[in-house]
Amino acid sequence: GPLDQLLGRNQLVLDMANADVRDYLFGKISTVLSNHDVSYIKWDHNRVLPHVDAAQTYGTYSLFERLRDAHPNVEIESCSSGGGRIDFGIMNYTQRVWLSDSNDAAERLRMQHEASHFLPMAVTGSHVGPRECHTSGRIHDIGFRAWVAAQRHMGFEMDPRELTDAERAKLKQVTQWWKDNRDWRHKADIKRLAPADPAIIAEIQVAPEQDRFVAFIGSAETSAWSCPASVKLTGLNPNAMYDVTLVNRDEKTAASRGTNALDTGTLRLSGGFLMAHGVDLPNHFPDRMWVLEGAAA
């Protein structure tokens, strides 16, 4: 666009349709990658274009392709939705995408749910943000922040020095769980669940062999239901028996009164039962997440 264009976030837009611009960027970026041990770069795009221009996108594809050919071991993460950089075309040249500059776990829960129509877990970056989110000012429990990030390609975007001992222990627990389960989850199908309670946002990730699953049941707001409804799962082998465990039962709050079979142990249930009847979970505060995993018995 012209030099007198309106600024966005105090920035102009590089004309990626211009081969000279692409050559300049390739030379500068490639020099850095050649001279330093860099394994990952993030391509930020945080302002709208001054006008619609498909050549801008194709030019970006061309630059990424050259960088990938010259540096095949360097991973590229494309950012962000605000710049329209998440599309199926860009996935030919990048390993991950970044949904938004907001790391507010409540907003991320919804974003990731909607993006799951198109993007698998392995390519969707999601980070544990600071105690107070820089884009919303909200303060969320470390468990909620960590489990929302663990739904996707997990990372951290925070100062760990702010963590209490209890928060540090919880973050370590969730991170270890993510590492222990990432291999099979990278190949899993994400299926959105449809809980009867509109306050709940939930999904299930099922291994291709249907022998493992994990369900994330998030409380997006205060529920109007005095008694939580069963959450029906999907995508399972109806004839298989699954050992079902509430991974984070230690996060049970005062919102849950009475006892629940998942509070202390593992249930063995058929896939048919889990899909037809569902699972009864303890009640929860808003901005909390239950994590339910199952393995074929």
Residue ranges and their predicted role:
Residues 1-141, 153-158, 162:
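Active-site neighborhood of glycoside hydrolase catalytic domains
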Residues 1-5, 51-52, 193-204:
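Carbohydrate-binding/catalytic loop surfaces
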Residues 39, 72-74, 95, 147, ...:
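Structural beta-strand/beta-sheet cores of well-ordered domains, especially the beta-sheet scaffolds
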Residues 44, 76, 149, 215-217, ...:
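Hydrophobic, well-ordered secondary-structure elements that form the walls
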Residues 134-146, 205-210:
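Structural motif
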Residues 143-193:
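Catalytic cores of secreted or luminal carbohydrate-active enzymes
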Residues 195-238:
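Carbohydrate-binding surface patches
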Residues 221-297:
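C-terminal beta-sandwich/jelly-roll accessory domains of carbohydrate-active enzymes
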